[in-house]
Amino acid sequence: GNDTIMVDVPEGEHVLYFFVKLNGYSRVILGAPGASGPVVNHLDGKAVERYLDKFSDAMHFTRGKLKGKIRAAFCDSFELEGNNWTPGMFAEFEKRMGYSLDPFLPYVFQRTGAMGEPVREAYGSSFSPEVTRDVIERVRHDFWHVQMQLFKENFIDVYNDWCHRNGLKSRVQAYGHQLHPVETSMYLDIPECESWIHDGIGRVMEPNQYLSGRGYSMVNKFVSSGAFLANRNIVSCEEQTNVGNIFQTTLEEVKVTGDRSNLSGVNHSVLHGFNYSPRQKDFFGWIQFGTYFNENNTWWPYVRPWMDYKARVSALLQNSVYQADIAILPPLEDLWSIHGMQRDPYPGVTYPAYANDLWEAVQQSGNGCDYVSEKVICQSSVAGGRLRFGSRSYKTLLLMEVESLEPRTAARIADFVAAGGRVIAIGKVPHKGLGFRDAAAKDARVKAIIDRVVATWPDRFVRVDAPQGDMLGWYRTLQAEYGLTPYAKISDPDRFMMMNYYKSGDRDIYFVVNSSIERSMQTRLEFPAEVAAKQAWVWDAETGVRHMLDVQDGTLELCLTPAEAKFIVFEKDRGGQMLPAPAPRSANPIALNGIWDV
């Protein structure tokens, strides 16, 4: 139209900010026919409930043929492309944070780019470091927290209630903008993550590059940690997702991706890409974002043995409890203050750069760990040198370059140290509070608490330099210096070999994986005396066969061939056959490279 906006500009130099507010602009990405319309406002509980009720009114989950037949309602990852506002936001912000967002709005908003990620470019006014640190970053932190609270109340809680009213479990990939990567999974019946096939799977694991050959996505460890904290026995995963090597992927790469997925805490794999395609459908059938699981694939005859293997692994892990006595508090609050919440599992910023490598090094060295949050720490009990939350119990808390804490979190950490626990602050020591309101008072309170703890128990609250380069070597040094006793000592740790420790009744279960598809791994495992007193077995998930092992003085020499995984199980049962000696290997093996004839 011909509408005009008049601005009365006083004398001097000014920067004019303007906003474009769009209502209902977002549409479902690649929606199926009939489901490609507008995206519901996830911050409006009434709109969410109306949408869900329309669905259940048509499907009748609680009566008729579907009653009791549907296990769960599934919600895929949240790719909301910039959904950051809802009617009443100003009032909600002031009610929750105690001050008005209005005067700060131009400075906390960031230009929105693809998938809701902020555009990384300079624009608008420039501010001093003090204003950026003490005002803008603190208000931004509060704004993200209000969005996170509104999302939980208006979508997660509404979705959960709707599922349970309809006799369904809630299964959700609960991460991304406006969702806490640990806590949101704790609210759900079946939290889910995702594992992808990327270039280099089984061949490379570059440091500080969360896509480099990993298989599991960076969010998997967050999701599984939340599930274990909430005592969930199912950690689901959209597995074998694939966009770059759909037809070139080998079954060997599929196996390694699945094994690594399990190492990240997954115990329930949902095969992505196992799509139904009518036989009359031309090559390559119906496939979207999945690996080519199809009867026309050359390795199709071998899919069933792999699926049997996955079923055995899942059955064992679902009936066992992953063990962890190290808690990791990542600097999420600092990240959100400085850079904003991220679009997990593909964050625009990884903070610090090694953030997704630390838990790997812990498990590559024989220890076990969970991510925790400030809320988890505050709700934990402390006694006997342990931080306890539900069934989880930790002897050591790693603060990963954490600078900011709520005063109540700092106080709980002090209680933990006073009770005999150990805190290792990596790179930085917490010294300030969170949020804009009463910032100076909260800063002083946090600093005073931490300073007192450091002065009183310098041997139990320690600061160490952040890793530079060799994460595994750095952690091994930390492990030795501070007595971080592993569940089994690994003589020759390797980035491609990882071990998870589980308990099931009186069984001690070690899941050991060689995720290299190019080389074998030879190592010596030394088990604690109370474990080694039981009979050792090897459970072969590829065949379902069990054999006893001869473990002398608690030590086992273990060789894993490329892409091989084994369960080493200690139990009281001593009746069975010993593992046969391995067949001799050729002294002159032939490498099958390039084109060859049979």
Give the predicted meaning of each segment.
Residues 1-70:
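Mature N-terminal, pre-catalytic/accessory segment of carbohydrate-active enzymes
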